[in-house]
Amino acid sequence: MGIVKSIARLDQRTRRRLWLPLLTATIVLVYPFQTTVVPAWHIRVIDDTGLAVAGMKVTEHWQHNSLESIGHEDFQTTDRDGRVSFPARPIRSSLFARGLAPLLKTLKEGNRALLGRYASVVVWGNRNYETGVAIYKPGEVPIGEIVISRAK
């Protein structure tokens, strides 16, 4: 309440000069800006001989660990060319939340706190093939091809 009292003590002319910058700063701090957790991910699943594998289940997992407490997933099946495409995964969050959420998470979880973006895909669902995994590294182009081996 000290700030409110200080502002109330200012003369009317000074208050008129301050209201627009204060309003602008408040809007900038609380406006939910969009960030991409993981860009669109286009994957081709092939076997160890280089042939496309149709009918494989592919699950994409993603989460912005700094801003979300739970992750998300989406499931698709490869087409006859062994391809699946997942759209970009955006999240909206204010600058205030982006500053406060990681701090609170670190205070709560200590050095075990996971921060930042995470995404991966898992290729599975056919007994003839082993499971395949690819992990997205923020700032890089997602892996476009996953090679799975025949089960032995």
State what each model feature region is.
Residues 16-40, 44-51, 59, 64, ...:
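Beta-strand-rich domain onsets/edges
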Residues 12-14, 74-83, 107-112:
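Short, solvent-exposed cationic patches
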Residues 92-142:
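A short, solvent-exposed loop/turn motif at the edges and junctions
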Residues 2-24:
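N-terminal Sec-pathway targeting helices
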Residues 56-62, 120-123:
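Extended low-complexity, serine/threonine- and proline-enriched intrinsically disordered segments
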Residues 53-54, 85:
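Generic structural signal for well-ordered beta-strand positions
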Residues 66-92:
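Short, acidic Ser/Thr/Gly-rich low-complexity loop/linker segments typical of extracellular
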Residues 41, 56, 74:
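Residue-level detector of short, conserved catalytic/binding motifs and their immediate flanks
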